[in-house]
Amino acid sequence: DRYYVKQGNTTEQYIAENSIVKVYGSEAAEQVIDNCFQIFGGYGFIEEYPMAQAYRDNRINKIWEGTNEINRMLCGRAMITKALSGEIGFKEYLEKVDTYCRDNLDSGYEGEFKSEVECIEAAKAVYAICLNESLSRHGQDIGTEQMIIENLANILIFSYVADSTLSRVMQNKDLYSRKNQIVPELCAKVYTAEQGIRVMEHANKILNSIYDGEIPSELNDKLNFL
């Protein structure tokens, strides 16, 4: 009995991370299989070729264990709960973001992955700003604003995946030969560059929804600085 209680508590504690991994993993697999399917062309539909079954079998991954839409709601609402309860130091972090933007501070990071680190940290800051504005506008009713929750979740997913990927690349720097580091490093850089651009798209959808297309100039200045 104690085992199941502990298991339930642990699952609850990491519900946001669990949802992120489920969504990203299933959608990344879908993208890979779809690209492979495209290579086969019309033959991809023929059962004698490998992609037909892979394409069919993978489709269920976005449905079971909670559809990806539901998991986006779960991770979005979980982070809101953590922010409101003070568990993650949301107010303190938001104050740091305000100071960073107001005083035009530099990240202070120096290294090979400076651009990637700054992109990821900017995404986290954008998430905090958008979450704060959403809470200010909708209060306790934020949980019913599915479009806002979905876009907040998309920013969160990028931040989590990019941060985890880059952290692993940097940790492994002294463990493997340079030859074995090249591909993981390029993957981290490409993912951060390609998906980082979309963070502002998600942010604009959230803020335009809140302010009916008239985002305050002060808020725009913050986003432009980041």
Set out the residue ranges of the language-model regions.
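Alpha-helical interface subdomain recognition
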Residues: 1-226
